[in-house]
Amino acid sequence: MDYCGRECTILRRLLDEDVTYKKIKLEIETCHNLSKHIDRRGNNALHCYVSNKCDTDIKIVRLLLSRGVERLRRNNEGLTPLGAYSKHRHVKYQIVHLLISSYSNSSNELKSNINDFDLYSYMSSDNIDLRLLKYLIVDKRIRPSKNTNYAINGLGLVDIYVTTPNPRPEVLLWLLKSECYSTGYVFRTCMYDSDMCKNSLHYYILSHRESQSLSKDVIKCLIDNNVSIHGRDEGGSLPIQYYWSCSTIDIEIVKLLIKDVDTCRVYDDISQPYIRGVLADYLNKRFRVTPYNVDMEIVNLLIEGRHTLIDVMRSITSYDSREYNHYIIDNILKRFRQQDESIVQAMLINYLHYGDMVSIPIVRCMLDNGATMDKTTDNNYPLHDYFVNNNLVDVNVVRFIVENNGHMAVNHVSNNGRLCMYGLILSRFNNCGYHCYETILIDVFDILSKYMDDIDMIDNENKTLLYYAVDVNNIQFAKRLLEYGANVNATSLSIINTAIQKSSYRRENKTKLVDLLLSYHPTLETMIDAFNRDIRYLYPEPLLACIRYALILDDDFPSKVKYDISGRHKELKRYRADINRMKNAYISGVSMFDILFKRSKRHRLRYAKNPTFINFVSNIKWYKKELTSIITETVKNGERIDSIVDNINTDDNLISKLPMEIQREILYYSIK
């Protein structure tokens, strides 16, 4: 065998794209041992010529065969000349026939090289011969060899063919009808809607959307032959969603691709933070090309079929609010209003309940089209539904709702019997990790508080806002409620009892919540009620803080409650010893106990600069925290009043003419 150690002239000439029969005939006829000439890649003369990009001349092939060049020679890639020729861009039926050879193997079995022809490669060529397809598939029942490239591109014959520049419907139809033949070739990689992979429609649209050469005949042929318009790719997109990325949209093609499709259905894109769907993608600039254009005729077509109002709402508001096409949204709402004004009201409710980013202009557009904020749907006002939205609540949206007659919801329980703010509190503030939202919650409360008839309103479970704030251990919100007048002594459910349980779950400053509540002086009855219930706690500090407070109210407190405090005899002994110290220490004939716990803050202010009062805490061990807080507050208030008096006396005014002691007395009454 004559392997070319240097470039073999005849083989190199056969690879030239300008080679012709006239030019090469003499060289072939005069070449010595042409059948022995092999290049470094293992190609013989036939390999070289049929791999040439030129228009293959059957006369040259016949001439090479007549000179003994082997049809069955395999090159380094394992390909015979037939296998190499099947990758040509313009395969000819007659040449394939010439290159096919039958032979007997070592077992004397009749074999053929027919399976070397790579149908996958052939289907990607520009010129498909239907006769050749029928010959290979029907007559010869061709099967893929190990050298076919299906494993590389992963596509079936139909999938490959539709990606060619100009697939012909008649070829496509024949391929689709030939799936029944047992050849071993894959015709379509995605056969069923449940496969969740691109089907032939996806590939056709994807490969032709830039060239704008989509054919209605090809699309119709695919659809009519069981290529499903309902098939979804790996990300969940339908063929019609691929079509939206074309710069020109043909409504007739749209009609073909959406028949019986739920065009308003939406889903979450797992690869990116977007809500996707047929209508949603059509309206979203992100999934369209420039120039962005929305045809209301197509929009109407998309919302004519079956749909739910939730899906319609999510479709038209699924994208970035900075890119909303308000004109289109307004037209869609007008269309529904013409059918029934209650539809727009339902869309408002659904938008507030499910919208991933509620936009005030969209809400205003819904109001302009007949929706209202003061109408209930299933016993819920719109504000109720907004507060159960799983996405972040926008303070500005809340303000817009209540300022547009949505404030009525504030004094009504929702359809599940809960307070208006219940969903807002529970959905995001049910563990310490969400306390970054406290500012939003407090800002929302500040807006709603102006409309509240009763801050201690109870829901169907006899729970108040303060109870819920304590239940979710939201100290800042509880503090704001107390500042606005919420009653720590609410009798419906024990707030103190709940605080003991929830406070003990905090890793740091375990008594902060109960300290806040106790600073608002719950009554003895409230404390008794708390300890008459089942008490649960993880750490004892909140419980002990409440016991200390209750003993100040009544030394005999332990005997008046069901909860067994007597087991903590050591703590009780210590607390009572501190109380006795306070009762036996006097200033101006008044016991420290009375000054600290019985008299008013105004009375206590008189002792703000008294060293005995200020230093008293040093002799107290178990009530040190409580006394330090009281004395610090008293001194701070005293300094505040002194500062006010100093400022008053810098000007000539009526109060400045009064003696300073009287000025202070007047200011004392400003302290509760």
From Swiss-Prot:
Task: Provide the residue intervals of the ANK repeats.
Answer: 41-74, 77-108, 196-231, 235-266, 282-312, 344-375, 378-410, 461-490
PROSITE patterns in the record: ANK_REP_REGION, ANK_REPEAT
Note the superkingdom of the native organism: Viruses
Q: Which Pfam families does the entry mention? A: Ank (PF00023), PRANC (PF09372)
Q: Does the keyword Glycosyltransferase apply?
A: no
Keyword terms of this UniProt record: ANK repeat, Repeat
Q: What is this protein called?
A: Ankyrin repeat protein D4L/I2R
Q: Which organism is it from?
A: Cowpox virus (strain GRI-90 / Grishak) (CPV)
